[in-house]
Amino acid sequence: MDERVKEAIFRQVGKEPFAKKFGLQLVELGAGYSKVEMTFTPDMENLFGMAHGGALFALIDEAFETASNSHGTLAVALNLNTTYVSSPAPGSRLTAEAREFSRTNKTANYDIRVTDDKGTLIASCQALVYRKGSPLPFL
């Protein structure tokens, strides 16, 4: 992976308002791979006291966004198909890992899995991006 791209993505995530709001932390980044973490806090609960799907989706999307843009080419989401498997315990540290499993000049596909700090599968997602062909604007 190009170190300039890696540094730029880490820098952008560090100042992204949405990532700050949810406490999303980019911890690993490689070509077609990303690991993002967050802590499940009480303000992320739904009306049943469980993890809100939107909070989990935010974690998934951040891993997807960073993995799909790791090649230095601007990539935007086309489709995400998410399955929520279980609800994490309050205070759990959650990890989303996005792995690229196919890429062409125009599209790329990713498998994203969310686990808690005990290794329990919380959610899984298959996602598709459109690769615009232009470099990342913040390089």
Go through each PLM region and give its residues.
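Terminal targeting signals and extreme-terminal segments of soluble enzymes
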Residues: 1-139
